Every structure is written in structure tokens, then in C-alpha cells.
């Protein structure tokens, strides 16, 4: 089993696309990249801890490759927006691919270069690629949010879904 960590704005919106893939064992919402151990949602939202909202994915590389996960990640984000994603603004929503191995770093960097060269976007690809740091699990009510609160999830992700349909379909 391998581990991948992606930050792409609100973690509620990052779970379902990965959970639906074969070879995914778990997708958990949490916080990473900051300086405070075990932060709360309120602390992260106050933008004082340096953390991003992220998802931790445990996957079977025999069924789905890290490269495939990175490609799926891009299709959930606006990789030209360094200051948040869609409705969610601020450093805690910045797009980041956190790598856990040097091989993951190489794959992510090549994928980013390929996306930039593709001409899909007029703006530079600004998603950062950073070494993984401790991942702190978010509170229970955030886990599987799209299943527990489908109406609120739909409302909170409307702008994202419109962008994804226009730019990735």
C-alpha cells in the first residue's frame, strides 16, 4: 500500500472523486503543512497555523498508480490559483501536491510540466509540490462530508463543479 496527500481547497470536495476509484483503500480529510501539532478546524480556518486542508489517500499501486492519482487531482482543481480554490480563499486552501517519496516528487513534477506545456490554461500552473509533513486527521464530522450532508456539500461546491465542467470535461 502507498500513501498520497493532496490539498485542493476545501477537503470536503476532494474526497468523492478519489473514493470512487478502484484501488483506493481510504480517503481521509485532515490538515498538513503547518507548525502546530494536531490543529483544530477552527485553528486552521483562523489562518494562524500554516496548515492546508488536505486529503490523505491510501491506495494499492497494483490497481491504481500514483501518476493516475495526480492526473485525477489536477482535474479537481484550478491549478492556476495559488490563493485558494473556488469559493474558498486563503493559504489554508492553497493547492499543493505533497510527496511522500522521491518517485512521487518526480511524477508530480513531470505531470505539472506536462500540464503547463499542454496549453490547457493561459495562466501558469502554480500548484506547489512539497515534501509531506505530518498529517492530522480532521474532526469526525468532516469525514465523508459529501455523504453525510449532500445538500450542504452541493451548495458549497457549486462554483468548483462549474469550473471543472468548463475546464476539465
UniProtKB/Swiss-Prot annotation:
Catalytic activity: L-methionyl-[protein] + [thioredoxin]-disulfide + H2O = L-methionyl-(S)-S-oxide-[protein] + [thioredoxin]-dithiol; [thioredoxin]-disulfide + L-methionine + H2O = L-methionine (S)-S-oxide + [thioredoxin]-dithiol
GO molecular function, a single term: peptide-methionine (S)-S-oxide reductase activity
GO biological process: protein modification process
Top-level EC class as recorded in UniProt: oxidoreductase
Active site residues of this protein: 10
EC number from the UniProt entry: 1.8.4.11
Keyword set, alphabetical order: Oxidoreductase
Entry coiled-coil feature ranges: none
Superkingdom of the organism of origin: Bacteria
Similarity comment text for this entry: Belongs to the MsrA Met sulfoxide reductase family.
General function of this protein: Has an important function as a repair enzyme for proteins that have been inactivated by oxidation. Catalyzes the reversible oxidation-reduction of methionine sulfoxide in proteins to methionine.
Protein name: Peptide methionine sulfoxide reductase MsrA
Species per Swiss-Prot/TrEMBL record: Streptococcus pyogenes serotype M5 (strain Manfredo)
Gene behind the chain: msrA
